[in-house]
Amino acid sequence: MKFIKETKEGVLIMIYVQPKAKKNAIEGVDGWRGRLKVRIAAPPVEGKANKEVVKFFSKLLGAEVNIVRGETSREKDLLVKGLSVEEVRKKLGV
């Protein structure tokens, strides 16, 4: 799976965010972009969607999650600390 990579710092998850959705959810894999497609209810205003992305993935994975790339873009890279690639895949259901 191209959208999940192991690094020295932790596991990198590459996502594509669709803000202002009805609810927060993982939509599946965007094959064209090679990223995990995620719907987020928060609007992309004043960092609200970014905060919601971090909160959503932190709760889902039960680990520390930070945005390391794409603060102002829909394409974001998340760094997950304290989990292996296998654990992340299992918790994401992919």
UniProtKB/Swiss-Prot annotation:
Top-rank taxon: Archaea
SMART domains listed in its UniProt record: DUF167
InterPro entries per the UniProt record, alphabetical: DUF167 (IPR003746), YggU-like_sf (IPR036591)
Pfam families according to UniProt: DUF167
One GO term describing the cellular component: cytoplasm
Gene3D superfamilies, sorted: YggU-like
Similarity comment: Belongs to the UPF0235 family.
Protein name: UPF0235 protein TK0768
Origin species: Thermococcus kodakarensis (strain ATCC BAA-918 / JCM 12380 / KOD1)
Lineage per the UniProt record: Archaea, Methanobacteriati, Methanobacteriota, Thermococci, Thermococcales
